[in-house]
């Protein structure tokens, strides 16, 4: 029996060993591929939710990094002192405990700013990208509402952006939801035409969370700058994965999430330009922390973790991107070579390689997910995964409803291994073939029948 105290000590020791392993890997990253770091702790304590050793050890492979990434052990190492020893309130200015925490908070602010080419004073800590998106969209719209009552966004934004815009519509604002092309990329001419004299904000995400498409952010920033309209981008899926510079790209507001870049959950940031100054109306009242834009005590351990994750991303981005690109190519080629009628959703070139969305014709996506129970995958955004409706992102790019229902998102990240990619491809190929053999539609296609020519009737 392992008691809770001893279990916690074992957990911390295991993470420290993993951290040392990760550090040694980092030293040789130019030539040695990163191996997946797997931590499986079996706790047989009376309050443990795990009922057997098999359940604890035999966990699925993780291929859903768009939903969340594992915490990098080096990030945990940076956080631990502020969870145990340096627990002062960073806003307490009268003693050393507060000063220590404040210094750590400001260092984290510098680390986040450095990753995106910003001034540290332009970084505001939040609870995550959802809050950052709400502050950016509602904050700008409400501050300038006396003169400007119009916003522009796209139909494929994250749900929190779309819901924020719908909330503003209920307050009397007008919102233009731009369609996207079949590639998933917006038409820049349509964007220019959509901007009106009273447009206050354009919000376009950097990398789509479902299909991985990269929008032309620098070109959008140039258009917004020339029309004197503020430009916000939800960069939760892009920060730390692709190079971003808020000044070169003329970005006025940017949303950042900690748990999408191997940092902790519950923390994020928003970049708000100082020169020329972007004004936002605060969403919550309180002690006026974070320059009055986000009241509430800043959680020092979490922002330290976010800062450490950003610093690691800046150091290792190029290596990670090359490695993830090779693994993604290996996965797609393996599947496409062995399975007919597989469609890759979204633009194959303007695309972040770690997010792969494939549709398997004549297979129901939910059935395939259930069959692939030993691989953690998703059929779309984690924020809408409870819905059985086809993805609104896939509908927006013109995907047929049957293909939209058959889509699976594969996420490849920093700790994904070649063996995991090969195993996932092998299992996917096996189960797609098995499910197709059970499908009358697949049998009809094999017999040469054009399904689109059939007029289906209800009984």
UniProtKB/Swiss-Prot annotation:
Entry EC number(s): 2.8.1.7
Binding site for pyridoxal 5'-phosphate: 129-130, 237, 257, 259, 297
Entry comment describing in which tissues the protein is expressed: Ubiquitous.
Intracellular or extracellular location(s): Mitochondrion
Entry keyword Zinc: yes
Sequence positions bearing Cysteine persulfide: 383
Source taxon at top rank: Eukaryota
GO MF annotation, one: pyridoxal phosphate binding
Residue numbers annotated as active site: 383
Top-level enzyme category: transferase
A GO-annotated cellular component: mitochondrial [2Fe-2S] assembly complex
Activity regulation field: Active only in complex with LYRM4.
Transmembrane segments: none
This protein's UniProt keywords: Iron, Iron-sulfur, Metal-binding, Mitochondrion, Molybdenum cofactor biosynthesis, Pyridoxal phosphate, Transferase, Transit peptide, Zinc
Required cofactor names: pyridoxal 5'-phosphate
Gene Ontology biological process: [2Fe-2S] cluster assembly; [4Fe-4S] cluster assembly; iron-sulfur cluster assembly; Mo-molybdopterin cofactor biosynthetic process; molybdopterin cofactor biosynthetic process
The family this protein is said to belong to: Belongs to the class-V pyridoxal-phosphate-dependent aminotransferase family. NifS/IscS subfamily.
Subunit structure: Homodimer. Component of the mitochondrial core iron-sulfur cluster (ISC) complex composed of NFS1, LYRM4, NDUFAB1, ISCU, FXN, and FDX2; this complex is a heterohexamer containing two copies of each monomer. Component of cyteine desulfurase complex composed of NFS1, LYRM4 and NDUFAB1; this complex contributes to the activation of cysteine desulfurase activity and NFS1 stabilization. Interacts (homodimer form) with ISCU (D-state); each monomer interacts with the C-terminal regions of each NFS1 monomer. Interacts with HSPA9. Interacts (via homodimer form) with FDX2.
Known function: Mitochondrial cysteine desulfurase, of the core iron-sulfur cluster (ISC) assembly complex, that catalyzes the desulfuration of L-cysteine to L-alanine, as component of the cysteine desulfurase complex, leading to the formation of a cysteine persulfide intermediate at the active site cysteine residue and participates in the [2Fe-2S] clusters assembly on the scaffolding protein ISCU. The persulfide is then transferred on the flexible Cys loop from the catalytic site of NFS1 to the surface of NFS1.
Protein name as annotated: Cysteine desulfurase
Gene: Nfs1
């Amino acid at each position: 029996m392992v008691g809770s105290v001893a279990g916690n000590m074992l957990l911390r020791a295991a993470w420290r060993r993993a951290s040392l392993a990760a550090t040694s890997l980092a030293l040789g990253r130019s030539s040695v591929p990163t191996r997946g770091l797997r931590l499986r702790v079996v706790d047989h304590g009376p309050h443990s939710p795990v009922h057997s050793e098999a359940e604890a050890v035999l966990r699925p492979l993780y291929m859903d990094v768009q939903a969340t990434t594992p915490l990098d052990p080096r990030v945990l190492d940076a956080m631990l002192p502020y969870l145990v020893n340096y627990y002062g309130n960073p806003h307490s200015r009268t003693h050393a405990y507060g000063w220590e925490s404040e210094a750590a908070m400001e260092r984290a602010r510098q680390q986040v700013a450095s990753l995106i080419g910003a001034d540290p004073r332009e970084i505001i800590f939040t609870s995550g990208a959802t809050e950052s998106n709400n502050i950016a969209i509602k904050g700008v719209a409400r501050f300038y509402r006396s003169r400007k009552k119009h916003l522009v966004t796209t139909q494929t934004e994250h749900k929190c952006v779309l819901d924020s815009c719908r909330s503003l519509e209920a307050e009397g604002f007008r919102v233009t939801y731009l369609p996207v092309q079949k590639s998933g990329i917006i038409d820049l001419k349509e964007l220019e035409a959509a901007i009106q004299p009273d447009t206050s904000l354009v919000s376009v995400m950097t990398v789509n969370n479902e299909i991985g498409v990269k929008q032309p952010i620098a070109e959008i920033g140039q258009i917004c700058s020339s029309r004197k309209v503020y430009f916000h981008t939800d960069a939760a899926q892009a920060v730390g994965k692709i190079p971003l510079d808020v000044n070169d790209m003329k970005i006025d507001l940017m949303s950042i999430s900690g748990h999408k870049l191997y940092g902790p959950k519950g923390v994020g940031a928003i970049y708000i330009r100082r020169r020329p100054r972007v004004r936002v109306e605060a969403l919550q009242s309180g002690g006026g922390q974070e320059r009055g834009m986000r009241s509430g005590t800043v959680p020092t351990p979490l922002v330290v973790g976010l800062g450490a994750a950003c610093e690691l991303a800046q150091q290792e981005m190029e290596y990670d991107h090359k490695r993830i690109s090779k693994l993604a190519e290996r996965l797609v080629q393996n599947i496409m070579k062995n399975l007919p009628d597989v469609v890759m959703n979204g633009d194959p070139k303007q695309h972040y390689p770690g997010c792969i969305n494939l549709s398997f014709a004549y297979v129901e996506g939910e059935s395939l997910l259930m069959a692939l129970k030993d691989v953690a995958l998703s059929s779309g955004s984690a924020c809408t995964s409870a819905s059985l409706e086809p993805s609104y992102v896939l509908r927006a790019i013109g995907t047929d409803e049957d293909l939209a229902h058959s889509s699976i998102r594969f996420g490849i990240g920093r700790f994904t291994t070649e063996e995991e990619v090969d195993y996932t491809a092998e299992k996917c190929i096996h189960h797609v073939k098995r499910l197709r053999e059970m499908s009358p539609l697949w049998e009809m296609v094999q017999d040469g029948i054009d399904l689109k020519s059939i007029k289906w009737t209800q009984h």
